[in-house]
């Protein structure tokens, strides 16, 4: 879940509630991604594909989808999740290996803070085709008063979302993270400075679930 309000105590409280009424802070945003797909849909790349849920959801909308992850177990899980579709490739390729303007959609969920942000965004700008889209669900370290306010909102809404989705307490209790985790280092404002400098016109917003979103359409 990452860094949170009140020296981490808020995060500990939320984690305890989330263990009783679990929901995925990352999967929650799949619907946002599916609602913002580009008009041309040849190739999509999900960077940091994890267990493959988003790759599987994108498959019906694109000619081909590539799920990328450096973790071999995550690639294995994505392969299993997508075993019923024929237009998916799972790979450890990195963005720098794609040709210029060859991809219509690049997605990243809770991944960008693992990467060198400036290098990654430059590769995104190069690889995306005209009118292609970048859709990011990210995490940032809370530092400004606005960041802390959004953390407070997430602390309040987190158990409500979990309770609505899973009204009965989970008997399993707290489970280990299903994918490698890392707390973010850059703040929202620091991420935004890089985004604005490299991807002019991108939209970045705070969201619930201790997340933010970045949306950018490459000029046609």
Describe the function of each predicted region:
Residues 42-50:
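Conserved class I S-adenosyl-L-methionine
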Residues 107:
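A conserved beta-strand element that flanks and buttresses the S-adenosyl-L-methionine
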Residues 115-124:
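A short, conserved alpha-helix within the catalytic core of class I
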Residues 141-194:
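C-terminal alpha-helical "lid/dimerization" subdomain adjacent to the S-adenosyl-L-methionine
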Residues 24-42:
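Conserved alpha-helix/loop element of class I SAM-dependent methyltransferases that forms part
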Residues 51-53, 57-96:
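Class I SAM-dependent methyltransferase SAM/SAH-binding core
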